[in-house]
A protein has these predicted regions:
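Serine-esterase "nucleophile elbow" of acetyl-processing enzymes
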Residues: 85-180, 194-204, 450, 456-472, ...
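Glycan-recognition and processing domains
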Residues: 87, 339-449, 529-536
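Alpha-helical scaffolding within the catalytic cores
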Residues: 115-120, 188-200, 223-231, 267-271
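Histidine-centered active-site loop/cap adjacent to the catalytic His
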Residues: 133, 280, 299-360
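Substrate-gating cap/lid alpha-helix
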Residues: 249-288
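Exposed low-complexity, polar/acidic, P/S/T/G-rich flexible segments that act as propeptides
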Residues: 503-505, 513-536
Length: 536
């Protein structure tokens, strides 16, 4: 085969790997491009095709020579020991330093389908920027690292992206940019409704890290995570998705000096692994490292890697998770390089179609074009939330708008930021008989298979000094729901006010019933039959 034929064959392999690749903005479907290019090569035509502009755009999006050069360089990088590359090489230089073994690592890294990640890594070989979104709770927002380490550099995703930028990116120029959507006391449902409103419009997301194994409750179990997963997987750029499965409370309670969570309970107790398998998600389980199986359950085995509060994970546990992600990405990267260098065509082209529902019982409960207004924020220093719900306050008696203070508050209500930027916020009242009326526009649900009506949901923030309120829609006071926001921990719980709501303008009324803080931290519009109470 001539050199020119080899080059043409190589380009076809790259295009085949990129079939359906949504990152190539400004060009037609990569599938069509690959077919058109294949026809031209097969015909051996010397005539120039009158599509110079399209071919220019293709070359701008994908430079095969650059991909080949970067493949050679990255292959050599992947031969090196990752412990010699990462930021902790002088502190933890081998698995045993992290209290890990090859066996525990293999159990902790639970690989899913790699096709989406492979396309991201091929994009990196082409020198394109990689966008990573982190969705999670207080551990991802910083936990106690700011207090214990005086820095948030040790967050698991920061360690991973620093490794990437100092190794892969230096060779390819494919630097990672992070977008944090991390808020303490917040579970998967809030993120399923709202995560898009916290990132730039039309952002090409490449990888999403979902840390949701701690912030859940028994009412919802893993169903909220399924809703979030479906929302992320259906994002236009078809990102690769990882579950970051942490465990809270593996330290000692400062008062009792006993392990707070001795049974290592997290969302993995409630069929999260089955959910990951159903959707082909790769998971990284801290439970497999810090806990051990006993009879039919689990028990805490390593209790010295928690933060100073005994609840959040400490810096070494963050490092363990980071190394899991690094090892997984390295392994898949080696497969991609083998595919490219050996001219192996990609037989598995990732389908963007979602599989059937798993925990959800009906499509009329599954989120589709959800609308979100929220006073929560992952960063009090940036006004990033782009509410997609039209909302007006038409009456406020005793309620005031509480936003996150820059000198601020922790998400759990403490008055010290500890370098964290996440904060609670919303419409807040302390006195009884306070009234809040919010006028919202409920648009029709554009679907051929389910009704165009919607559901209306209020998010209330719980606290140890929480109040109580009744909530209703329009004039339906006789159908009011009652929400008690007093709880041991500060969480953001969803409560459906009404289902099968016709399109148009509607008014949500909140009336407090006793003294205490009642905070409306969010207002959502969901699918017709989304009827949930006190889910996280």
């Amino acid at each position: 085969m001539s050199p020119s034929a080899n080059f043409s064959h190589f380009l076809l392999i790259i295009l085949a790997l990129l079939k359906g690749f949504p990152y190539l903005k400004g060009i037609e479907s990569a599938n069509v491009v690959a077919e058109n290019y294949s026809i031209r090569v097969a015909s051996q035509s010397s005539a120039r095709v009158h599509e110079d502009e399209k071919e220019t755009r293709i070359s701008e999006a994908l430079n095969p020579v650059l991909v080949l050069d970067n493949t050679v360089t990255v292959r050599e990088l992947l031969k090196e020991d990752p412990f010699s590359q990462w930021t902790y090489r002088s502190r933890w230089s081998e698995l045993s330093d992290l209290e890990l073994t090859s066996d525990s690592m293999s159990k902790a890294i639970q690989a899913g389908k790699a096709s989406r990640l492979k396309r991201v890594l091929l994009k990196a070989l082409a020198g394109k920027k990689i966008n990573v979104v982190i969705v999670g709770g207080s551990n991802s927002a910083g936990g106690k690292l700011g207090v214990d380490e005086r820095s948030l550099d040790g967050l698991y995703f920061n360690v991973f992206t620093k490794w990437w930028n100092e190794t892969i990116a230096k060779a390819t120029n494919a630097f990672v940019k992070e977008y944090g959507v991390t808020i303490g006391g917040t579970g998967s449902y809030v993120f399923a409704f709202c995560y898009k409103t916290f990132i730039p419009r039309d952002l090409d997301i490449d990888i999403v890290l979902i840390e949701a194994s701690i912030n859940f409750n028994i009412r919802g179990k893993a169903e909220p995570l399924e809703q979030l997963t479906r929302q992320v997987l259906s994002y236009p750029s078809a990102p690769a998705v990882f579950y970051i499965n942490l465990v809270s409370g593996l330290g000692l309670d400062p008062t009792t000096q006993k392990v707070i969570n001795p049974l290592c309970t997290n969302l993995e107790n409630f069929r999260q692994a089955e959910l990951a398998h159903h959707y082909g998600i790769s998971s990284f389980s801290l439970k497999e490292v810090l806990c051990r199986k006993k009879d039919e359950g689990w028990e805490a085995a390593v209790t010295n890697l928690a933060g100073s509060d005994g609840r959040h994970i400490g810096i070494k546990a963050h490092a363990q998770v980071a190394m899991m992600i690094i090892e997984h990405v390295r392994g898949v990267f080696k497969e991609v390089i083998n595919d490219v260098t050996n001219n192996v065509n990609a037989n598995e082209i990732a389908s963007l179609a979602l599989p059937e529902l798993f925990f959800l019982k009906s499509k009329t409960e599954a989120l589709s074009d959800p609308l979100c207004w929220t006073g929560l924020t992952p960063n009090v220093y940036q006004s990033r939330q782009r509410s997609n719900l039209k909302l007006d306050v038409i009456e406020s008696k005793g309620f005031y708008r509480k936003g996150g203070s820059k000198t601020g508050q922790y998400s759990d209500g403490n008055n010290k930021t500890d370098l964290r930027t996440d904060a609670q916020g919303g419409w807040t009242a302390w006195n009884d008989h306070s009234i809040l009326k919010l006028r919202i526009l409920v648009p029709p649900l554009n679907s051929r298979t389910i009704p165009e009506s919607r559901s209306v949901i209020v998010v209330a923030h719980t606290s140890g000094y929480g109040g109580e309120a009744k909530l209703w829609l329009d004039d339906n006071k006789d159908r009011a729901i009652y929400v008690d926001s007093k709880a041991n921990f500060g969480n953001n719980l969803l409560n459906t006010v009404a289902t099968r709501v016709d399109p148009g303008y509607h008014v949500v009324t909140v009336q407090t019933l006793r003294w205490g803080m009642f905070m409306v931290s969010g207002l959502f519009v969901g699918p017709p039959d989304f009827n949930r109470r006190e889910v996280l």
